[in-house]
A protein has these predicted regions:
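Symmetry-related core transmembrane helices of the 12-TM Major Facilitator Superfamily/SLC fold
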Residues: 182-200, 365-386
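Helix-loop boundary and gating motifs at the non-cytosolic
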Residues: 5-61, 224-254
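A late C-terminal transmembrane helix in Major Facilitator Superfamily
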Residues: 327-362
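Hydrophobic core of transmembrane alpha-helices in multi-pass small-molecule transporters
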Residues: 25, 109-131, 300-315
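C-terminal transmembrane helical hairpin of 12-TM major facilitator-type secondary transporters
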Residues: 275-319
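Glycine-rich segments within core transmembrane alpha-helices of 12-TM secondary carriers
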Residues: 148-171, 340-351
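Cytoplasmic helix-loop-helix junction between adjacent transmembrane helices
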Residues: 120-159
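C-terminal ends and interior cores of transmembrane alpha-helices
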Residues: 89-110, 283-296
């Protein structure tokens, strides 16, 4: 039986943290390699209309959002690792269930089948949201010493950020190689593997808190970070639109290269602590989109998306820092959950909008450009207002 003793580690990367990190990686890849490309796979063989295919993404993100209201109650009334285990297993089952709708002899025409498809996507979002929050916002933090928890938060977020690109790259590479339901079996297997890895880590028993409500925003959403969450959603929505309209391995790999460069640049204190880092990042992403508008050339699949990815990662990282700094120490899990909600919410809504506008690529990219402009304005206003308040209280 587990005891209340928690081992002390002098460094962040130990055996248990590494296992949980790998589990996070597998969980996110299992989702991001199957869900974002679901509209494409459904519409390619005329199994669903483009409108219905986009609704599957909307249903997924609604499931992610609604599941957050019950997260605090679940982890207070049941063992946290078992909540994750069951959620990850259910995610694998729903991923397998999606294959039944894609590979059919006849298109989906009956209304009951449309509702069933949307219900499966909603369930996928609900169990993924629960699993992701429990793992990155609770289990990873539980196995981390207090002095390392900020780094643990950043690690979890950066893993999610990279898998947003790694997942679609794997899907594009395996799409032609894995025919039929085998593609979904790979995604489900990754989800199952993440569940097994988490169960290999022992967690101390924690007595449940009293007075926990069934529906609550505790460990789900940070109200004081609503403006920051809006900016994050706008930024990631632009990313989702651009990924959808230019869904190639070369483009996604270049965006990921930009993410990696941003991760390295953020180790420089001058970059990490820059007051207008988010506005600068958005400006770089805007420049990249404008360069794509200007003319098509060899840099459209290399340099331009790398600059775009660098700007997006720089801006969203700055918003993460602001979100964590705006919360109390005991609210870090809530702040990270807020980031996850806004980041994935914006990303998948952008993907849905992008698939709906695939026949009008320029219009879709103009929408992405407008979203980044609005995000830049909000970022700049927030910085100026904060500076004005600091002078007023000085």
């Amino acid at each position: 039986m587990d005891t209340q003793y928690t081992p002390t580690y002098n460094r962040l990367w130990n055996r248990e943290f590494t296992l949980l990190t790998i589990a996070e990686l597998l969980l996110c890849i299992s989702c991001y390699m199957t869900i974002p490309l679901l509209p494409f796979r459904l519409t390619t063989e005329d199994h669903a209309s483009s409108y219905l295919a986009c609704l599957t993404i909307v249903a997924f993100i609604i499931g992610v959002c609604i599941s957050g209201f019950f997260g605090s109650w679940l982890i207070q009334n049941y063992r946290r690792n078992k909540v994750f285990f069951i959620s990850a297993i259910c995610l694998g089952a729903t991923i397998l269930g999606l294959s039944a709708f894609e590979f059919r002899e006849q298109p989906i025409v009956r209304e009951i089948e449309e509702y069933t498809l949307l219900a499966v996507c909603f369930a996928s979002g609900a169990v993924f949201g629960t699993a992701k929050r429990v793992l990155s916002c609770t289990l990873l933090i539980d196995k981390t010493e207090s002095c390392h928890r900020t780094d643990a938060n950043y690690t979890a977020i950066w893993i999610s950020r990279l898998t947003v690109i790694v997942g679609p790259i794997l899907a594009l590479l395996l799409r032609d190689e894995l025919r039929g339901s085998l593609f979904y079996i790979v995604g489900a297997a990754m989800s199952l593997a993440s569940a097994v890895l988490v169960m290999c880590v022992k967690f101390p028993f924690r007595a449940p808190e009293e007075g926990v409500h069934l529906v609550s925003i505790d460990r789900f959403f940070l109200p004081r970070g609503a403006t920051i969450a809006l900016v994050i959603a706008l930024i990631t929505a632009a990313l989702g639109i651009m990924m959808t309209t230019r869904m190639t391995v070369e483009f996604c790999a270049s965006v990921m290269a930009g993410f990696v460069v941003a991760a390295l640049a953020l180790h420089i204190p001058a970059v990490k602590n820059a007051r207008f880092a988010s506005a600068v990042g958005n400006a770089l992403a805007i420049i990249a989109i404008l360069a794509m508008f200007a003319h098509d050339d060899v840099f459209d699949a290399t340099l331009k998306p790398t600059l775009f990815g660098f700007g997006i990662a720089l801006s969203s990282s700055e918003q993460l820092y602001k979100l964590l700094n705006s919360c109390d120490h005991c609210q870090r899990s809530t702040a990270e959950s807020t980031y996850f909600l806004s980041s994935d919410g914006g990303l998948f809504l952008g993907i849905a909008a992008g698939w709906q506008l695939t026949t009008a690529v320029k219009s879709a990219e103009q929408v992405a450009l407008a979203l980044l402009v609005v995000a830049t304005i909000i970022c700049s206003l927030n910085v100026l207002l904060k500076k004005k308040q600091a002078k007023h209280h000085a």
